[in-house]
Design a protein with these regions (language model features):
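Activity-critical C-terminal alpha-helical subdomain
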Residues: 102-155
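Substrate-recognition/cap regions that form aromatic- and gly/pro-loop-enriched pockets
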Residues: 2-123
Length: 155
């Protein structure tokens, strides 16, 4: 029970997901190389201008990367923030920020993503084509597809 409380602290708050209102929330998580921390300043400045408050934020330092072609972790900083979907201008701001993130060599965590442009995914994940080739080999008829995979052109 103690481990569950530690690993899932929000579960101790009744209906924590309602804090963002009926429109719900999105979780935005990215990783950036050490030495590229100025991207945080740009993010926070823009979110402050939007008056977008996050109920939950987590900053972690990552170590080694996995060998998987679409692996998210790599050496650097990862930041996760939750935001209300009702924040005016948030979607446009994040679209613009995604471009800056790519320019800085960063990438979005695809598992938690619901909005990134499919054109940016190969730029964020240099081994994207390797993933597609593995996928074609393992599932040549394209039987196994998710909505997200179709949206991001992963299949």
């Amino acid at each position: 029970a103690a481990l569950t409380k530690y690993m899932h602290p929000l579960d101790g708050i009744n209906h924590w997901n309602r804090i963002y209102g009926e429109s719900g929330f999105l979780q935005y998580q990215f990783v950036i190389d050490i030495g590229k921390e100025e991207i945080f300043e740009r993010l926070f400045r823009g979110l402050r201008e939007l008056r977008a408050a996050s109920f939950l934020g987590v900053l972690k330092k990552f170590g080694s990367a996995s060998q998987a072609p679409l692996s998210f972790p790599r050496p650097g900083w990862t930041l996760t923030l939750d935001y209300s979907m009702a924040v005016p201008g948030l979607e446009k701001f994040l679209r613009d920020f995604d471009e800056e993130l790519v320019s800085a060599g960063g990438r979005i965590y695809l598992i938690k993503d619901s909005r990134v442009s499919p054109e940016l995914v190969p730029l964020m994940y240099p081994r994207f084509n390797e993933w597609r080739e593995i996928r074609r080999t393992m599932d040549p008829t394209g039987l196994w597809q998710s909505d997200q995979a179709r949206r991001l052109h992963l299949c």
